[in-house]
Amino acid sequence: MGIKNLNNLLRKKCPDVFIETHLSEYAFKKLAVDVSLFMCKFKAICGDRWLTSFVNLVQCLRRNEIHCVFIYDNGAPNEKSGEREERVKQREKTEQKVIELDMALDKYYMTGEIEPILMDLHDKIEKQSVPVQRLLTKAIQPPKFDIKSVKEKIEKMKNYNIKITPEDFQKTRELFDILQIPYYIAPLEAECMCADLCKRGIVDGVLSEDTDVLAYGSPIFLTKIDTKNDTCVLIKYEEVLESLKLTQEQFLDLCIMCGCDYNKNIPKIGGEKSFNYISKYKSIEEIERNMNIDVTVLNHVRTRELFTNYERHEVKKILYCGSPDFEKVKEFMKDNGINIDIEKLRSSFVHEDLIFVDE
């Protein structure tokens, strides 16, 4: 989930901290990547072709001469259990709805009868896609039932209701071994280890979609990667603090007040109000004291600890990416149904006149 609405707040308060950057700006540098985050993203967008997306990601980074290291989760704090339970309930709810929609879809194809559940979905699609100025006209002249858009929406619901298995993660490890890409298992959460590696100077940045990276204080946060155009959005932690005129401690309290995977925000106090309160009172304790607000839901003392006092991985140095055996790569791609240009992949790994040596 990341920090709730933090991106929106930053876009409003300090849009200049979002810098579109070509990936080549990080050539010869090391980036830490959270496997689970991209696994969820690729499965949701690409379905069964998710492993191909990992190949494309690695290929994109290597053709820009970036050395990536992938980090695996190894559990989560107890404080995250509530958030996990909510996700499970939502997934089960979506699964049941998809089953009912599929049954209604079958009935439509057999009888032409439109069940209410299909019509409700159709109406929601229409409201999302039709300009406001046309709503009155559509109210007078109801649209025809568009079965194609309904079917596409159901398929998207299936894709977003993803399931990830231990075998999926094992398959990525096999891929990274074949491609000679280093990877590690985090002491607990991968996002935490990624940020910590950057804070310790072991890697030069974190590639992620999760704003938790900023709450952990990672100096360099690369996000919104575009593997076709080789670009990303760069956010520098120190520039965020400077633009918001907050200290590290105040910014963390802001993130906690926004809400994250470990807590919920105070009802009716969103990102902007949280920012205004932190700017004025400097800490959650002072907000509670001066505003007479119940901050219990924030669980802020423990949440601060989770973002600052965590177990560190013992690694002191990350290896550079190696040179794959492309005959083995070719065999792996064939065995796993990955349709990719091997020569283009080879050219992404082979760069003239540069040899990286790990001391």
Predicted regions and their residues:
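Noncatalytic, basic helical substrate-engagement surface that gates or grips nucleic-acid strands
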Residues: 2-13, 26-189, 193-197, 219
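Non-catalytic nucleic-acid-binding/docking modules located in mid-to-C-terminal regions
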Residues: 13-31, 35, 60, 64-67, ...
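Short, hydrophobic/aromatic alpha-helical segments in well-folded domains
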Residues: 57, 193, 202, 270-273
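Short, hinge-like loop/turn segments at secondary-structure boundaries
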Residues: 86-89, 202-204, 223-227
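Acidic, metal-binding active-site segment of PIN/NYN-like and related structure-specific nucleases
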Residues: 194-222
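A polyampholytic, Gly/Pro-enriched intrinsically disordered region
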Residues: 204-211, 228-231, 244
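Conserved NTP-donor binding/palm subdomain of two-metal-ion nucleotidyltransferases/polymerases, i.e.
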Residues: 213-216, 221, 227-234, 238
